[in-house]
């Protein structure tokens, strides 16, 4: 049975240049929206990583504090032991003859001066407020083409990304400052450890002389 001519598919009307531009604009809007979503997700991941790093640095700082307190306690104990050794040496007459006088430990005052890891230092990075953030917020982050819900979401996403980037920058400054403080503290701990080691060696030598 021959097909009804009225049911034949009408030939496709070619799109006008305006329609082509509108289709392209819709595609660009979809791609841009997905890009802002990915940016927001990456910022969230970076924020979580930054928080974990700050927590780890805080835990590490507490461990360093305990180590340094231990060094200070060893130093205090050794001072007390040296007083006792001096008293025993006097009782045993070791110090009567200059040739028999034992060598006392000479302490470097700079090693045991007050801890400065918690003080503000001149090279501590300062947080700088960027006025461009406010200017961007007033003018908008994107150039609107379709003026639909997608562009509203893009604008909101970009605002959140801008805020997160500012927070990440501040977190990075905090990390850098904390690392500088901890590096100085590690240097102090090393100096105190070397001082305690030398002090113990001298005390052992004095004790051996008492036992002769």
Curated annotation (Swiss-Prot):
GO terms for cellular component: cytoplasm; membrane; plasma membrane; SNARE complex; terminal bouton. The keyword Coiled coil applies. CDD domains: SNARE_SNAP25C (cd15885), SNARE_SNAP25N_23N (cd15889). Residues 26-88, 148-210 form the t-SNARE coiled-coil homology domain. Exclusively found in brain and ganglia. InterPro entries: SNAP-25_dom (IPR000928), T_SNARE_dom (IPR000727). GO terms for biological process: exocytosis; neuromuscular synaptic transmission; neurotransmitter secretion; regulation of short-term neuronal synaptic plasticity; synaptic vesicle docking; synaptic vesicle fusion to presynaptic active zone membrane; synaptic vesicle priming; synaptic vesicle transport. The keyword Plastid does not apply. Pfam families: SNAP-25 (PF00835). One of its GO terms (molecular function) is syntaxin binding. Keywords: Coiled coil, Repeat, Synapse, Synaptosome. It is found in: Synapse, Synaptosome. PROSITE patterns: T_SNARE. Belongs to the SNAP-25 family. May play an important role in the synaptic function of specific neuronal systems. Associates with proteins involved in vesicle docking and membrane fusion. This is Synaptosomal-associated protein 25. It comes from Drosophila melanogaster (Fruit fly). The gene is Snap25.
């Amino acid at each position: 049975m021959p097909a009804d001519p009225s049911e034949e598919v009408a030939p496709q009307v070619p799109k006008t240049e305006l329609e082509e531009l509108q289709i392209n604009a819709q595609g660009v809007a979809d791609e841009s929206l997905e890009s802002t979503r990915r940016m927001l997700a990456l910022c969230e991941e970076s924020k979580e990583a930054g928080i974990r790093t700050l927590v780890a640095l805080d835990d590490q700082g507490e461990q360093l504090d305990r180590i340094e307190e231990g060094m200070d306690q060893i130093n205090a104990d050794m001072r007390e032991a040296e007083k006792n050794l001096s008293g025993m040496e006097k009782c045993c007459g070791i110090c009567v003859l200059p040739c028999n006088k034992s060598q006392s430990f000479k302490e470097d005052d700079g090693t045991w001066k007050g801890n400065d890891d918690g003080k503000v230092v001149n090279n501590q990075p300062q947080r700088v407020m960027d006025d461009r953030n406010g200017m961007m917020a007033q003018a908008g982050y994107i150039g609107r083409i379709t003026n639909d819900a997608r562009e509203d979401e893009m604008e909101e996403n970009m605002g959140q990304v801008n805020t997160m980037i500012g927070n990440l920058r501040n977190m990075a400054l905090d990390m850098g400052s904390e690392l500088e403080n901890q590096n100085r503290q590690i240097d102090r701990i090393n100096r105190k450890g070397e001082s305690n080691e030398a002090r113990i060696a001298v005390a052992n030598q004095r004790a051996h002389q008492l036992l002769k």
